[in-house]
Design a protein with these regions (language model features):
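Thiamine diphosphate
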Residues: 1-14, 66-69
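Generic beta-sheet signal
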Residues: 3, 79-85, 178-180
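Core alpha/beta catalytic barrel or barrel-like domain that forms the active/cofactor pocket
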Residues: 8-18, 41-42, 51
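Active-site-proximal loop->helix
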Residues: 15-27, 47
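Conserved thiamine diphosphate
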Residues: 28-74
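ATP/pyrophosphate-binding catalytic subdomain of soluble kinases
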Residues: 54-110
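Flexible, low-complexity linker and terminal segments
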Residues: 91-222
Length: 222
């Protein structure tokens, strides 16, 4: 279906006065978890990718230019688009994504995805992500490592393995990716249904509702 889903993730139930939510960090103390949340936080992007959403992206509420780009891409995409937006909650969870928004830290804690380009981050763009077996690892460029050794982003890959791997990269072990994780073209469900309807009409005619009601096995009740 051609729908856009935007998840504003502030790690809390803000509108209902501060209960812990499915994305609250482990141990988060709230009105409904006074001794700390005991559920591991849900990874929204991993779920969207696992459900085969054809467009999956992440941005940050205060990065207006980047957020606008992501929303524009989602609006132009034909099919289901899922966007996670890191959002602060000033009242009940202030500073939820501080590491991703502060100028002093965000170059080390975020990795901006660009299609066809290597995964590079850092204040001086001196760090990158490469695969070690089946797992990603952080490496420093220039110490026996070149850009050619790094993992290159491919948002068009039909197989969602790369997008899923990227969605699992979280602080403090990895920079957290932002941007478009996946953008693939597939036939839309509603378009395919309409094709079947049109084909049936062409083969059998438009049909009459009264005839449909009276056809096949029927019963009189009462």
């Amino acid at each position: 279906l051609d729908v856009n889903i935007v998840l504003f993730n502030n790690q809390i139930y803000g509108l209902t006065k501060g209960q812990y939510s499915p994305t609250s960090p482990l141990g988060k103390r709230t009105k409904t978890s006074p001794m700390g949340a005991i559920d591991n936080p849900l990874n929204a992007l991993s779920i969207a990718i696992g459900c085969e959403a054809t467009f999956v992206a992440r941005s940050i509420d205060v990065n207006i230019k980047h957020l606008g780009m992501v929303l524009q891409r989602a609006a132009e995409h034909e099919g289901t688009a899922f966007i996670e937006v890191y959002q602060n909650c000033n009242i009940f969870n202030d500073g939820a994504w501080k590491y991703a928004t502060e100028r002093e830290t965000k170059t080390e804690t975020l990795l901006e995805l660009e299609h066809g380009k290597p995964l590079i981050f850092g204040k001086n763009r001196e760090k990158g992500i490469r695969l070690n077996g089946m797992n990603p690892e952080v490496v420093e460029l220039g110490k026996g490592v070149t850009e050619d050794d790094l993992l290159f982003h491919d948002e068009k890959a039909d197989e969602p393995s790369l997008a899923y791997l990227l969605s699992r990269m979280r602080q403090p072990d990895f920079p957290e990716p932002i941007g478009v994780f996946r953008a693939v073209d597939r036939p839309r469900y509603d378009d395919e249904v309409q094709k079947q309807i049109d084909q049936a009409k062409e083969t059998l005619g438009a049909g009459e509702l009264d005839q449909l009601f009276a056809s096949g096995d029927t019963w009189l009740v009462g």
